[in-house]
């Protein structure tokens, strides 16, 4: 059963806040900024080049969209994982992997 508007808002807000919290150590270590404003999470890099990853909810389709490295990643709610995921990869591990790839760091 698809998420209602209210369920989507609550779950997407919680997912973005969890991502912000869980990426804080990597952000401190790697020197990039995490900005969560108006329901959108931005990962802002100055090195190795000025870049921004944008993580935002898309309410009409009940997905969280990640715009990073010239691509769009669309994560749907996974009842089995109790999180937003793309091909069974949850949001936080996806963002961690994309960030490390961008920074040229191994996991």
Residues covered by each model-derived region:
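N-terminal intrinsically disordered, cationic/polar leader segments
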Residues: 2-54, 58-107
